[in-house]
Each structure stands twice: as structure tokens, then as C-alpha cells.
From Swiss-Prot:
GO terms for biological process: autophagy; negative regulation of autophagosome assembly; negative regulation of autophagosome maturation; positive regulation of protein ubiquitination. The PHD-type zinc-finger domain is required for interaction with LRSAM1 and negative regulation of autophagy. InterPro entries: Znf_FYVE_PHD (IPR011011), Znf_PHD (IPR001965), Znf_PHD-finger (IPR019787), Znf_RING/FYVE/PHD (IPR013083). It comes from Rattus norvegicus. GO terms for molecular function: zinc ion binding. The modification Phosphoserine is found at S57, S80, S83, S246, S247, S248, S331. Keywords: Acetylation, Autophagy, Cytoplasm, Metal-binding, Nucleus, Phosphoprotein, Ubl conjugation pathway, Zinc, Zinc-finger. This is PHD finger protein 23. CDD domains: PHD_PHF23 (cd15631).
């Protein structure tokens, strides 16, 4: 019985000792580690100057935080001995960003932007710790202001030259991200390149002047046309030849004329060429001897190379000397 009673006695003290020793040790370690981690993160982010030469002040602040936490937990019993220390410790505790450390860990970039907006002394309990940070923030704001001024000047110059391509954009605010600014700068560069490229576009090449007067000289008959229908044929050929610059373009236009021109005109169905096909709006040339009108395609003549004097196949067979001389026959000859 004595042995049985003596066995539980050594088992009882370990469970009573464990809760007494372990909880305060765990609590102390977690708070210290958390404070060190927060101070490291804040110093790395630039909110707090790195504490290189004053390690004692950091340890004192940690002790003051522990006393404040104990004072809040215990109640009014510990208030009387810790009243002077609590008064002195509360301002630094308010200045320390312990409650904001979780937000800093999750979203450090957003806090950087907020600090740029607020500037030095923007927050109530956060201004003293951000005193070493105002210089880079001011430099960034100044650079942004300079960029916005340059953009406004560029837009004003572009407004004088070109109309606005779309609805007016809102002025850039401080809340815009750096990526948006880079995109806007790229757009500005592209617009400048388009403006410069648009000014250097070459003018469309016009047809050469010597080619234009050739068709009317050759197509128009020297004397009066034999009939009114032939005069109409000459006028139509003149307009078609003046508008065309090459044989391929002339053929396309002839096809268009065949489709578009009405067939009510008398000259449209007139047959004068030895191919026994009507005028049909195609360019023709008059023989210098007999005065008959023949299609250029039937005579194998290009519009760009129309001769001054043309002789049809019949005249060439009957009067070969006219071809050798290259001029009109004498008036006495038939």
C-alpha cells in the first residue's frame, strides 16, 4: 500500500511543473521573435531606419512592450507601480508599427504607394518612423510631375497638327501604376513615329506629260470626219486614250466601258474595222489614206506607241510605196 501510494507522488509534480514553466517561455519567445521579424521587415521596407548603433534601445522597447501587455492583462493591480513607465512607454508603442506588420507582410507594394501619396508626416502615429524616407519619395513625385508636363506639351503640339483620334483622356493621377505610365510613354512614341512617317509619304506619281498629247495628235483626223458617227468615235477614243497610261490599264478600262456605256448611241454599233466587229467603245485609229477606222488591237498597235501616220492592211497591199516613204501620198493620186 505504501508503495502504491508512493508511485503517483513522483508522477504528480511533472504535470504541475510543465504548465508553470512552458507557457511563459513560449509566450516570451513568440513575442520577441515576432517583434524582431516585424522590425526586420519594416527596416527592409524602409519604414524604420536600421538600428545598427543602438541595440540597447531595441531591447528596451521590447521590454516596455512586454510590460504594457502585462499591464493590460493584469488590470488595475499593476497600474500603480508601472504608471510612470507606462506613460513613458506608450508613445513609442504607438509609434511602433506592430499592428500594421501583418499588412506589410501581405501587401508591401501597396504601402509603398500609400507612403508616396502621404509624404513625410502623412500618418498620425507613423510619421516619426518615416522621416528617413521622404527624400526618394519627393524625387519620384518630381519625376512624375516632369513626365506629366512633358506629356502635356507633346499633346498640345500634336493637337495643333492632328485632330484628336478619340475621346479626351483624363489627366494622369498619382494613383496610376508604373506599368500604365510605361504604356502611355510607348503610345506617345508610336504616335510620334506615325506623325513623322506620315509627313514623309511620297506623292502619287502622275503620268508623264509627253505621253498625253500623243493620242489626240494621232487619233484626231486631219480633216473633217466622214460622218458624225466617226466623229463621235474619235471623241470616245480620245477620252479613253487620255485616261490610260499603259496597255493593260487600257484593256481594263475598255472592259469597264463595255459594261457601263449604254448601247443606244449610233456609233456604238458602227462596223468599220476589217474584223467585222462594232466600235463597242474600244480605241480606234484612222487610216491616213482611206480614212477607215480600225481597232488598235486589230492593228497590233499599243496605246503608248501610236504612230503619226497609219495605213490599213488594204492600203499597204495596194500602195506599198506609202509605207516606204512614211508620209501621205500626193493629192493627185487616188
Amino acid at each position: 500500500m505504501l508503495e502504491a501510494m508512493a508511485e503517483p507522488s513522483p508522477e504528480d509534480p511533472p504535470p504541475t511543473l510543465k504548465p508553470e514553466t512552458q507557457p511563459p517561455e513560449k509566450r516570451r519567445r513568440t513575442i520577441e521573435d515576432f517583434n524582431k521579424f516585424c522590425s526586420f521587415v519594416l527596416a527592409y521596407a524602409g519604414y524604420i531606419p536600421p538600428s545598427k548603433g543602438a541595440p540597447d534601445s531595441a531591447t528596451l522597447l521590447e521590454k516596455m512592450k512586454l510590460k504594457d501587455s502585462l499591464f493590460d492583462l493584469d488590470g488595475p493591480k499593476v497600474a500603480s507601480p508601472l504608471s510612470p513607465t507606462s506613460l513613458t512607454s506608450r508613445p513609442p508603442a504607438a509609434l511602433t508599427p506592430v499592428p500594421l506588420s501583418q499588412g506589410d507582410l501581405s501587401q508591401p507594394r501597396k504601402k509603398d504607394r500609400k507612403n508616396r501619396k502621404l509624404g513625410p508626416g502623412g500618418g498620425a502615429g507613423f510619421g516619426v518612423l518615416r522621416r528617413p524616407r521622404p527624400a526618394p519619395g519627393d524625387g519620384e513625385k518630381r519625376s512624375r510631375i516632369k513626365k506629366s508636363k512633358k506629356r502635356k506639351l507633346k499633346k498640345a503640339d500634336r493637337g495643333d497638327r492632328l485632330p484628336p483620334p478619340g475621346p479626351p483622356r483624363a489627366p494622369p493621377s498619382d494613383t496610376d501604376s508604373e506599368e500604365e505610365e510605361e504604356e502611355e510613354e510607348e503610345e506617345d512614341d508610336e504616335e510620334e513615329t506615325t506623325v513623322v512617317g506620315g509627313g514623309g509619304v511620297p506623292a502619287p506619281v502622275l503620268p508623264t506629260p509627253p505621253e498625253a498629247p500623243r493620242p489626240p495628235v494621232t487619233v484626231h483626223p486631219e480633216g473633217a470626219p466622214p460622218t458624225d458617227s466617226e466623229g463621235k468615235d474619235a471623241g470616245s477614243t480620245e477620252t479613253s486614250q487620255d485616261g490610260d497610261g499603259s496597255s493593260s490599264e487600257g484593256e481594263m478600262r475598255v472592259m469597264d466601258e463595255d459594261i457601263m456605256v449604254e448601247s443606244g448611241d449610233d456609233s456604238w454599233d458602227l462596223i468599220t474595222c476589217y474584223c467585222r466587229k462594232p466600235f463597242a467603245g474600244r480605241p480606234m485609229i484612222e487610216c491616213s489614206l482611206c480614212g477607215t477606222w480600225i481597232h488598235l488591237s486589230c492593228a497590233k498597235i499599243k496605246k503608248t506607241n501610236v504612230p503619226d501616220f497609219f495605213y490599213c492592211q488594204k492600203c499597204k497591199e495596194l500602195r506599198p510605196e506609202a509605207r516606204r516613204l512614211g508620209g501621205l501620198p500626193k493629192s493627185g493620186e487616188p
